[in-house]
């Protein structure tokens, strides 16, 4: 099943980028711990690295730049100059080295945003998260850059999690 998920993800993402005519597709990933590769004992098993390896097997000039960092929310990837966000418990700052402004400065063909749950975990309302996504997407579109927003996925596709599992929820 894990190979099926990875194959499907790769197929969909490659299909989205097949129309690029430039030699070498340039993709930037913005995200949190899953995209950064947390939870894997071998960084080559992180989904971004597997995706990079796959794309480069098709064309060695394809690049995938990973700007993800564990714990990040959509607040961290907002444009440079965006005011910090106050959750009521702490202030979330924009990271100018890992945000949409930095991503666009790399002249990508596409940006993948992988931010599964940290906004909710930090008490950021869904409406605010959606507003952040809209701002980021609008900036990318204005630059002619495609954006894909991914959902949650396993941290890796090659290691089994060691439980605990209920009887009806066993790994493949």
Map each language-model feature to its residues.
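Bacterial N-terminal signal peptides that target proteins for export
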Residues: 1-9
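Surface-exposed amphipathic alpha-helices with a cationic face
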Residues: 137-141
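A short helix->loop->beta-strand "cap" motif at the edges of active sites that frequently abuts
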Residues: 143-146
